[in-house]
From Swiss-Prot:
Protein name as catalogued: UPF0246 protein HCH_04801
GO BP of this protein: response to hydroperoxide
Family: Belongs to the UPF0246 family.
Domain of life: Bacteria
GO CC term, one of those recorded: cytosol
Cross-referenced PANTHER family: PEROXIDE STRESS RESISTANCE PROTEIN YAAA, PEROXIDE STRESS RESPONSE PROTEIN YAAA
Organism of provenance: Hahella chejuensis (strain KCTC 2396)
InterPro entries, alphabetized: YaaA
NCBIfam families reported in the protein's UniProt record: PRK02101.1-1, PRK02101.1-3
């Protein structure tokens, strides 16, 4: 199986990385094209474009000004260890065994507004560019137009290379929209995570994001190969709920 997840806005370029192994992103020419557009924007323009504070806009303007090829261990970091948001708190990559990191390199793909698709050990320089950003480019008015079918084609190549027979979608809607599901070569299963709140099961954003990371970790640590095995996921009190599941939408619920 092949897993897709979202990136994170929060980054960590300080904590020592537990491996020296690294690879290069596959779409660096496209990334460079986007960076060239972003380099031309003043911080206040980035603030408007990204909906961030002046401080964050200045930080990212500086990031884009210093973004340069080639990537190496001195100026970049493996994606799996660079992202630090809720999904990656649940995944807890720094505590994965080497075998699980190797499994991640084969099975896990991170969708990215700037880099397209990243393998866990692909080096990346720090950035902020969410997939939903309306960045005018040569192909259209946003990043969905920029990437077009590139991400879908890339995932299909990964499917052929790895022999995966299903895609496990653990990405957010914002990022998964960049994939044309109708053109994927394999079926898709989308796990949903719901918590009991106010007498009803609801998607609570923070917990759902963390749970996506925990399920990714569960798949990698246990070397799962068949989608049915995912139904045994029980981390942090979640369990498969057949009554709330519908076709390829698999529900996992938790009571508090």
């Amino acid at each position: 199986m092949l897993i897709v997840v979202s990136p994170a806005k929060t980054l960590d370029y300080e904590t020592p990385v537990p491996t020296t192994e690294n690879t290069q992103p596959r779409f660096l020419p496209q990334s460079a094209e986007l960076v060239d557009i972003l380099k031309q924007k003043e911080p206040w323009r980035l603030s408007e474009l990204m909906g961030v504070s002046d401080e964050l806009a200045t930080l990212n303007a500086n990031r884009y000004q210093s973004w340069s090829l080639p990537f190496n261990e001195d100026n970049a970091r493996q994606a799996l260890f660079a992202f630090k948001g809720d999904v990656y708190t649940g995944l807890d990559a720094y505590s994965l065994e080497q075998d699980a990191i190797s499994a991640a390199q084969r099975q896990l793909r991170i969708l990215s507004g700037l880099y397209g698709v990243l393998r866990p050990l692909d080096l990346m320089q720090p950035y902020r560019l969410e997939m939903g950003t309306r960045l005018q480019n040569a192909k259209g008015a946003n990043l969905y137009r920029f990437w077009g079918d590139t991400l879908t084609q890339s995932l299909n190549e990964e499917v052929r290379e790895t022999g995966a027979d299903v895609l496990i979608n653990l990405a957010s809607n914002e990022y998964y929209k960049a994939v044309n599901e109708k053109k994927l070569a394999v079926p898709v299963i989308t796990p949903m995570f719901l918590d009991m709140k106010g007498g009803k099961y609801k998607v609570v954003s923070f917990w759902a994001k963390k749970a996506r990371g925990m399920m990714t970790r569960y798949i990698l640590q246990n070397r799962l190969q068949r989608p049915e095995e995912i139904k045994n996921f029980d981390t942090d009190g979640y369990s498969y709920n057949p009554a709330l599941s519908d076709g390829a939408q698999w529900a996992f619920t938790r009571d508090h």
